[in-house]
């Protein structure tokens, strides 16, 4: 009997979660996500561009009362390994826009809604290029002060963001959140376990 109740609760939870996700026209999955563009609030603008000949799909978040004739600091937000722009990267992009920044969260190439084959691959050099591509795109966005661009990398995106900032002087500030350096782990093993072997 208990197992039937547990199964029923799990099914009900999946249905409710799927229903909640379908209610958001942008596919955002976090609480209080932008669900429609409203004057005087943070708005979301789906965009697309190319990096290395492959289509990239992104969301730009503009602050409440955005005025393209003003100059705003911009922040690129890199998602975790295996993540997509609708998850934690979108949450941070929205919260930063609520603080007055213009932000961009993009699906890395080969992942999410962006193009590229084979799917669901995560190569450090590509992810670093993707961050450069976000900087390229956001620096041309109306209202962005291209001399004031920052970057936030989450989990694996944190390591890639540090790599991108090393070679891109347009990125003036970097922050990471729960950073994981995939490149270092691939070279040296987890916690540098392969260095002395």
Q: Each predicted region: which residue ranges?
A:
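The serine-hydrolase catalytic nucleophile loop
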Residues: 82-94, 108
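N-terminal cap/lid segment of alpha/beta-hydrolase-fold proteins
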Residues: 24-70
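Glycine-rich "HGGG/HGxG" loop immediately N-terminal to the catalytic nucleophile
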Residues: 87, 110-122
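Alpha/beta-hydrolase-fold enzymes
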Residues: 150, 160-197
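Alpha/beta-hydrolase active-site loop
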Residues: 121-142
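Alpha/beta-hydrolase fold nucleophile elbow
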Residues: 142-155
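Short beta-strand element of the alpha/beta-hydrolase
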Residues: 69-80
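Conserved alpha/beta-hydrolase
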Residues: 95-115
